[in-house]
Amino acid sequence: MTRTLAGKTVLMSGGSRGIGLAIALRAARDGANVVMLAKTAVPHPKLEGTVHTAVDEVERAGGKGLAVVGDVRNEDDVRTAVNAAVTAFGGIDIVVNNAGAIDLSSSEQLEMKRYDLMQDINTRGTFLLSKAAIPHLRAAGNPHILTLSPPLNMAPHWVGRHLGYTLSKYGMSLCTIGLAEELAADGIAANSLWPRTLIDTAAVRNVVGGAGRARSPQIMADAAYAVLTRDAKRCTANLFIDDEVLLDEGVTDLSVYSPAGFAGDLALDIFVDPA
């Protein structure tokens, strides 16, 4: 099997910036079609990038892009994005569940509207976008669903920390495991991907902190590309860590993803324990 995304159609939630945009641009360099469903129609006062600027970058990178302004929580918006992808490019080969919300407050301090937001975007959005694309994935040659969610680390120090966020992210990973089983007979792969270290994104800079000890989003893009170009029938039901994927691909020098001149210890991401 030739490992390329040339001519493949990727339907992604979010993607205006950060990891999602990096994944989109890696696909675009192969000549993929990238359809982005995102709310960012106009610039954010503090964050760079909109769904329109992201599509412009996709096209400059060599792909074809389509922006769909909408909310992954809204069933009509999701249907619109699916239909737009099929109308523009003839089908859907890949779904990337990238959109996410984060609030690391304790259970006592977490406002229920923030809890609901995380559940609706993270867990429900993953289920909804995947569900809506299934009929079209069945018709694809090497169909994949890739969800940006963590391994199910049941250590109490993770389950009991920022519980509201943990529930929403683990729900995404359970969706991966369930879809992989449900769709195995159709040859549709479902996998999750999570970074070992913090990634230098707006969420890390603004919520988590520690961007100076973080890898670039490109490591997630390269790992996602590796997963999405594998045989869907043989690569499914995995909760991958980014650098493990790359090591399996024969990549041994991961320093290119670290900050220039950085020689210290990188900060581990949430849900990842020291080796």
Language-model region placement:
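Conserved Rossmann-fold SDR core element
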Residues: 27, 91-93, 173-176, 183-195, ...
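Catalytic loop of short-chain dehydrogenase/reductase
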Residues: 138-139, 143-185, 196-199, 205
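C-terminal helical subdomain
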Residues: 192-193, 209-275
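A short, exposed helix-loop element centered on a Lys and neighboring polar residues
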Residues: 130-131, 177
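Substrate-binding pocket helix/loop in short-chain dehydrogenase/reductase
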Residues: 106-107, 111-116
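Short-chain dehydrogenase/reductase
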Residues: 3-88, 103
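Active-site loop of short-chain dehydrogenase/reductase
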Residues: 8, 63-64, 91-92, 137-151, ...
